[in-house]
Amino acid sequence: MNNNTWILVAHRSGARLFENRGPGKGLNLIFDIYHPEGRLKNKDLDTDKPGRSFDSRGHGRHALSSEQEPTAHLAEQFAKQLSTMLDDGRNQQRYTKLVLVAEPRFLGNLRAALSATTAALITATIGKDLGGIEPHLLSKHLTDIVRL
């Protein structure tokens, strides 16, 4: 059985998956996914605004809200896509430990999307957006968590 650790560094507009095969082995990039939809704003996605309503009595007006913002929906879909890849890797026994690194809101999306079996492999999480930094700088943020 391997002792590999997978480190997922993700944000709404992309993700990188690294593997560490043990102390002194460093980080190996497994994949890099660009998700450009994650950069869009609600106004870019929502052309059909919910509209307004009027009080049945009086002169009040209220905006109607949609159930979920389009950007939140896209983030959830991307988190589910990443979760499927993590499940596949677990099913293939490619790793035994998992570290999640993401900005806090997207980290919540990832946790919600993970299966219970995959979530049980999480050894640490970092609630920071480190998606844009170089791998050699990333290792400085992981030294207390993974022996690289």
Give residue ranges: language-model regions.
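Terminal alpha-helical anchor/extension segments at protein ends
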Residues: M1-L148
